[in-house]
């Protein structure tokens, strides 16, 4: 009986010693999860990205890192709120403003089409909102316009290799103001969805 008791205590002690180690494994994986093959990814944000004429550089709206297990094609969809603010003053004021959005895969812009017969490959930039206002009047007039609306677009990337990739959505304000006035833009709530697919062998974007 004495031997059996010692044996049971030894087993119980070993089990209790292993419990803290078992708890450490999920915690470590939670902090540094191993990259897994992407099935379908969605990222979103609600922070407002403001762009004005003093900021000529593009801004990054969303970013995600993923891994494809086998060579695949990607369908990339972006939806977001686009706002424009234009201020034009007489006697002869003009304001042009538009926001272009595009996606970059591993630092390279994804074209809308790569087919030379359709004008490709292009730079992948899409106009999400656009405005031109001209004011000509002998009277003193200050015209301020503020609008916001939602838009969406989809890109496609063919034959993406099986490795870790970074996908970014970027935007830039193009503005031209003459006379008195100003122009600004903002992107609000936005969603990026990326889905690996296998299209037909002769598929083209």
Give short role names for the model-derived ranges.
Residues 2, 21-29:
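Low-complexity repetitive segments in secreted/extracellular proteins
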Residues 2-15:
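Bacterial N-terminal signal peptides that target proteins for export
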Residues 6, 18-19, 120, 184:
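Compositionally biased, low-complexity repeat tracts
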Residues 12-24:
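Bacterial N-terminal signal peptides
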Residues 26-205:
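Extracellular jelly-roll beta-sandwich "head" domains, especially the C-terminal globular C1q domain
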């Amino acid at each position: 009986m004495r031997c059996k008791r010692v044996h049971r205590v030894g087993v119980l002690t070993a089990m209790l010693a292993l419990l803290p180690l078992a708890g450490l494994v999920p915690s470590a994986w939670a902090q540094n999860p191993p990259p897994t093959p992407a099935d379908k990814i969605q990222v979103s944000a609600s922070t407002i990205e403001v762009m004005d004429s003093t900021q000529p550089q593009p801004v990054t709206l969303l970013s995600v890192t993923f891994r494809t297990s086998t060579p695949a094609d990607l369908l990339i969809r972006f939806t977001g709120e686009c706002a424009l603010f234009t201020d034009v003053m007489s006697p002869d004021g003009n304001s042009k403003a538009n926001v272009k959005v595009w996606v970059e895969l591993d630092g390279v812009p994804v074209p809308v089409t790569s087919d030379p017969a359709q004008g490709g490959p292009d730079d992948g930039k899409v106009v999400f909102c656009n405005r031109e206002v001209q004011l000509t009047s002998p009277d003193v007039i200050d015209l301020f316009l503020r609008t916001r609306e939602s838009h969406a677009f989809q890109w496609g990337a063919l034959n993406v290799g099986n490795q870790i990739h970074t996908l970014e959505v970027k935007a830039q304000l193009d503005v031209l103001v003459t006379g008195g006035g100003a122009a600004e833009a903002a992107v609000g709530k936005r969603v990026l969805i990326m889905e690996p697919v296998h299209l037909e062998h002769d598929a083209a974007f």
